[in-house]
C-alpha cells in the first residue's frame, strides 16, 4: 500500500518516512530463542530485519546508519528497544527514514507515517494475515489478507485551500506469494523477488546499527 501511494505521487515529493512496530510484553517470555541472548536473538534481529527490509525495498540501501539499541525490561538478556535512522538511501537520498520498535509500547502508535510536500499518510494496525493464521483461517479462504475498512490508513492532503482527511484502501497481503515465487524460480527459472544479496544487505545494516549504538 505504501509503495502504491508513493508510485502515484499522492503526497508529492516525499520528505519523511517512519515505520514503527509497537509491541507490549513487559515480561521475559520463557522457552524462546528470542529471549536467550544467543546470536540472532533480540528485537533488532527479529522485528528489525523486517522494518529494515521494507525500507530498503522502497528507498534502496543507505550510505550510513545511526541507531540507538537498548535493553529496557528488567532482567532481559536481549535488546528490546531500537530506533534506527537510515541516512541518504540510494533511491531517495533526501528522505528522512526512522525505524522504531520496543517491547514496552503499551499505547498504540502508527505503523506508518509518511510526510510529503503535498500531504501525509498515517496508518495504524498490522497486516491481518498473522492474526488470521493464529485463528486457524487458511490462506485459501475468500477475501484472504483483506483489511477491514475501519483499519485503513488516512491520507491528509490539501484541496482548494482545505485539509482533507480520506481513508486510503489497504491492498490485500499475501504471504503465499513469497513461496510461490520460490517454486516458480526453482521449476521455471522465474527471477527471485528477494535474493540472497538483499538478505546479506539487511544483515549488514543490522550489524551497522549495533556498531552505531555501541
Descriptions of predicted regions:
Residues 84-94, 114-117:
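Active-site beta-strand termini and strand-to-loop segments that position acidic
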Residues 205-214:
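Short arginine-rich
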Residues 1-75:
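Predominantly a Rossmann-like dinucleotide-binding segment in NAD(P)-dependent oxidoreductases
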Residues 76-81:
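A short, glycine/Asx- and small/polar-enriched loop/turn
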Residues 113-193, 197:
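C-terminal glycine/acidic-rich active-site capping loop/insertion
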Residues 18-19, 66-67, 98-101, 115:
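Short beta-strand segments
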Residues 49, 74, 100-108:
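Glycine-rich phosphate/pyrophosphate-binding beta-alpha loops
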